[in-house]
A protein has these predicted regions:
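N-terminal beta1-alpha1 cap of cysteine-dependent amidohydrolase-like domains
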Residues: 242-400, 404-415, 429-437, 474, ...
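Amide-donor transfer/coupling interface in amidating biosynthetic enzymes
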Residues: 339, 346, 385-388, 420-503
Length: 503
């Protein structure tokens, strides 16, 4: 979705890719043609129009030398891509090539990856995961030629049909099969919400494992007569076909463990027995409110070198009814820093909130996050202004990501004041898996004491996005007990059943 400083837009961009190295080893022409068809079909399955699509190609071939056969491989690929563009009515506007894909006696497979891009409307975007149990599943396929390539005219009509069905809200989810055929498509569609498939009586299992380029699997929002029936989604995380059952949990485990030896997705501790976590509950009976109300509170959002979500933060505050003021900290010279300190002190004096947004202030150097923000707020003038806001004017502070790390390291969390911290104080440290994590997680409200959570109830579960390398909160047992008692544990991670977990 394209951001705008003020207002709302539904314009968004989409990008998809297509390539199959196994086909490329057999026929460079067919591989390139299908790469174009696949990349555009992926856009269509997401809710974009093929008429708005443009292409860019990434080409990578073995060193050509004086071998005519080697020279013929990129030529065949380009001919396949050109025919696809002409016949399907979509043009490439950029690309990059390399003819150095050889090392001693090892050559890369002939490679032409098609990237398709398009602008669209967020109202039409659909995601690929199954949404509901009991939904009808159908397969729409174009006419084929040469046994592998879709007929161009038939595929263009199919693109238009799928686009219309999505715009008319008759599709809950959509997917176009690629390298793994229909089996891969149905399996991946079931992953997100762990839904299975009950195949229609007499469904030919052989269809699951062949190529189906240009086809579409649709989860229908209503029972309409379109396509070839596949079956229906089920709450049971299994495939049921011709009296046999396949456990998808085991398939998922095998799928996710493929790269486990080189890129672990869980720690050794997580693979063992799960650590128990109590379900915390703290319901605030009395709330602190400012002595003097403000119809449109002012929010100061300081931007440090490396901050990267100040626009999103300001937008969220603006939509909630506040008046955000974004101020860029100038650290070019010591004199500029002093000027910024004076300006921020003045801005805090006329604000009701301070919002520290996320990012990588100072490049997360040296040796850790938020050190520049922490140093800035420990300036005596800023410390005094913050104390005046929080302790005398009943103001608020909020920190997200890098900003929350600063609140921890300043002592504002959990002590409510800028203090000198020591080894006994809570901190945020590196994830146990040893690398950055970016995913959707489920959290449960444990306490609604915070003004930011006053309209929630303990036990409410939300799905939120996380993206961090240092997201592990660490504190001593005594400190944790005190935080629990005071209602300062705001949320807990939970599993799919809503049970608190330390995983």
């Amino acid at each position: 979705k394209l951001p705008v400083p003020h207002g709302e837009t539904k314009t968004c961009s989409g990008m998809a890719w297509g390539y199959n190295p196994f086909i490329a080893e057999q026929s460079e022409y067919h591989s390139a043609y299908l790469a174009v068809a696949e990349s555009v079909s992926k856009l269509v399955a997401t809710g974009f129009s093929a008429k708005n699509a443009y292409l860019t190609f990434q080409e990578y071939f073995e060193r050509l030398g004086a071998d005519p056969t080697r020279w013929g491989r990129p030529m065949a690929s380009l001919l396949g891509a050109l025919d696809a563009q002409v016949e399907l009515g979509v043009a490439a506007i950029g690309g990059k090539d390399s003819m150095s894909g050889s090392f001693e006696n090892i050559d890369v497979p002939p490679t032409l990856v098609s990237f398709a891009v398009a602008a669209g409307n967020t109202d039409n975007v659909v995601s690929p995961e199954f949404k509901l149990p009991g939904s009808k599943l159908v397969l729409l396929s174009p006419a084929m030629r040469d046994g592998l390539l879709p007929n161009a005219g038939s595929l263009k009509l199919l693109w238009a049909q799928v686009e219309t069905l999505i715009k008319e809200k008759k599709v809950l989810s959509a997917y176009t099969p690629s390298m793994g055929g229909l089996a891969e498509a149905l399996f991946k569609m079931g992953l997100g919400n762990r839904l299975g498939v009950r195949f229609a009586p007499g469904f030919d299992a052989a269809k699951l494992f062949g190529y189906a380029y240009g086809s579409f699997v649709l989860e229908l929002a209503e029972d309409i007569d379109v396509g070839t029936p596949i079956g229906e989604t089920t709450a049971r995380y299994v495939w049921e076909l011709n009296g046999e059952t396949a456990d998808l949990a085991k398939v998922q485990e095998a799928y996710e463990a493929k790269l486990e030896p080189v890129l672990p997705y869980r720690t050794a501790e997580a693979a063992g027995p799960a650590q128990e976590a109590p379900a915390l509950k703290y319901e605030a009976l009395n709330r602190v409110a400012p002595k003097v109300g403000t119809a449109k509170p002012r929010v100061l959002i300081p931007v440090f070198p490396g901050t990267n979500c100040e626009y999103d933060s300001a937008r969220a505050m603006e939509r909630a009814g506040a008046e955000p003021e974004v101020f860029v900290i100038n650290n070019l010279t010591p004199a500029h820093v002093a000027e910024s300190v004076a300006a921020v002190k003045e801005l805090i004096g006329r604000s009701q909130m301070i919002f520290l947004p996320g990012g990588f202030s100072g490049g997360d150097e040296p040796e850790g996050s938020a050190k520049f923000i922490t140093a800035f707020f420990r300036n005596p003038a800023i410390t005094e202004a913050v104390r005046g806001l929080l302790q005398k004017r009943d103001g608020l502070m909020l920190g997200i990501c890098n900003g929350f790390q600063a609140l921890i390291k300043l002592g504002l969390v959990p002590f409510g004041d800028i203090v000198e911290t020591d080894d006994t104080c809570p901190t945020l440290t590196f994830n146990t898996i040893g690398r950055h994590q970016s995913m959707l997680v489920r959290t449960r409200v444990a306490s609604n004491l915070s003004p930011w959570l006053q309209y929630t109830k303990p036990g409410d579960v939300h799905t939120v996005a996380v993206s961090h390398g240092e997201g592990r909160f660490v504190a001593g047992a005594e400190t944790l007990d005190r935080l629990v008692k005071n209602g300062q544990i705001a949320t807990q991670y939970v599993d799919l059943s809503g049970k608190p977990t330390m995983d």
